[in-house]
Every structure is written in C-alpha cells, then in structure tokens.
C-alpha cells in the first residue's frame, strides 16, 4: 500500500547552484529508482536558519513530496546522513487528505522557486482621507463633538502612617 511522504532537507549555504542542482537530482533519482511515485520537488532557495547548525547561519531548503511503500525512507535518510552537503533533514508521513498531487509531472531540475513577498507595513491608525473640497472640510469641523467632561474630581485621601507600633504596657506584677 502506498503512503504519502514529505521530506524537507537543508543543504550547505556554500554550495554553488550547480552543486545544489546535482544534490536535488541525486535524491530525486534515488526515489524514482526505488519505486517512489509522483515525486514532486519544491526548491525554497537560500534562507536564514532559525538557529545555527554546524556553525552555519543559512542553507538551501528543498521539499520533496512522494508516494511510496516506506522502504525508501531508511536508505534515503542514510544517504543524507552520510552526505557532507546535507546539514539537516526531516521526513514525515502525510495523511490522505494532506497530499494533493499535481495533474502533470514536474519538469526536470529545480522547480517552484517562490518569490519573496514583501508587503509594506500597515499603519497602526488609518489616517483620515483628505477632503475633496473646502465646503466638506467646513462641515466636518462643525460636526466634531467637543471632548467629554472628565468625571467628578476625586477628593483628597488622608494618608495614615502605620509604621508606628503601638505597645501597651504589660503588668509584670501578677497577683495569684
């Protein structure tokens, strides 16, 4: 029975694009030779690591989705563990509803290179739109309500110094 798997691995940042391409092809070819089906590769590019791994700050991220019977996982992970180019890898088994294969097979080489999306920061408070005419501005000024009156003033509170100790004299002569 075939199951869906997802593997993400990180390659060393000092590799050239040709070497990254060779590593991706090496692992893709290994999967196809070992009866994995619908191998899809997504190249995420060079990204900053969340924390240093082997004194490295960056790495090339690659995601592979495939279907197989599970016998490909151990040899593939062994290849990655022995490789000097792979600094980290993780394989997970996907549920049936998580895996959605593409209708067409992926082309050779690095595919699905995402473009970084840079959105301008949104202002904390939206600025009012400028008035189109001066008449509207005059009307807007007239409709502005004055600020509400503050609540009744609070009366002054008397502070009491409680640091003094009140000591009552003790009668040491006791009559029994």
From Swiss-Prot:
Composition bias type Low complexity, residue spans: 140-160
Gene Ontology biological-process annotations: translation
Taxonomic superkingdom: Bacteria
Pfam families: Ribosomal_S6
Residue ranges, annotated region (Disordered): 97-176
Keywords per UniProt: Ribonucleoprotein, Ribosomal protein, RNA-binding, rRNA-binding
One GO cellular component term noted in the UniProt record for this chain: ribonucleoprotein complex
Any one GO molecular-function label of the UniProt entry: small ribosomal subunit rRNA binding
Compositional bias segments (type: Acidic residues): 161-176
Keyword set includes Ribosomal protein: yes
PROSITE patterns: RIBOSOMAL_S6
NCBIfam families noted in UniProt: S6
HAMAP family linked: Ribosomal_bS6
Function in brief: Binds together with bS18 to 16S ribosomal RNA.
Family classification: Belongs to the bacterial ribosomal protein bS6 family.
Protein's UniProt name: Small ribosomal subunit protein bS6
Gene that encodes the chain: rpsF
């Amino acid at each position: 029975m075939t199951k869906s798997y997802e593997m993400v691995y990180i390659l060393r940042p000092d590799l050239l694009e040709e070497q990254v391409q060779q590593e991706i092809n090496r692992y893709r070819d290994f999967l196809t030779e070992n009866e994995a089906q619908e191998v899809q590769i997504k190249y995420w590019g060079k990204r900053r690591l969340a924390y240093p791994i082997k004194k490295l700050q960056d790495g090339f991220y690659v995601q592979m989705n495939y279907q197989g019977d599970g016998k490909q996982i151990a040899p593939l992970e062994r290849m990655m563990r022995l490789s000097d180019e792979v600094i980290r890898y993780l394989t997970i088994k996907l549920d049936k509803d998580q895996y959605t294969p593409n209708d067409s097979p992926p082309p050779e080489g690095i595919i699905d290179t995402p473009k970084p999306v840079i959105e301008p920061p949104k202002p904390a408070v939206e600025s009012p739109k400028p008035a189109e005419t001066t008449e509207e501005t005059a009307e807007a000024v007239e409709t502005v309500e004055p600020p509400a009156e503050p609540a009744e003033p609070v009366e002054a509170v008397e502070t009491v110094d409680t640091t003094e100790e009140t000591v009552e004299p003790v009668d040491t002569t006791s009559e029994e």
